[in-house]
A protein has these predicted regions:
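C-terminal structural segments of small proteins and small subunits
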Residues: 2, 10, 40-64
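Structural motif
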Residues: 5, 23-24, 31-33, 59
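Context-gated lysine
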Residues: 10, 30-31
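Short beta-strand/strand-turn micro-motif
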Residues: 16, 20, 32, 42-46
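Structural recognition of beta-strand segments within beta-rich domains
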Residues: 24-27, 33-36, 41-43, 51
Length: 64
């Protein structure tokens, strides 16, 4: 099983951990739904920047 850590950042701010143990990532327009292995959901507004499947990391540019 491949689970991801999702990091987000706003312009001129440090990157922060948004969610951990993410099994599903569902883009919905300007929103991104993140579902973890326990079924908990986190919704963020932003744009996907990168996905590194080897390191299990996802980066999102968060809306201001």
């Amino acid at each position: 099983m491949c689970l991801a850590r999702v990091y987000g950042h706003k312009t001129n701010e440090d990157e922060v951990l948004v969610a951990d143990s993410i099994a599903n990532i569902i883009p919905e327009g300007k929103k991104i739904r993140l579902l973890d292995i326990f079924g908990d959901e986190t919704v963020v507004e932003g744009t996907l920047i990168s996905m590194d499947l080897e390191r299990s990391t996802v980066r999102i540019a968060l809306e201001n």
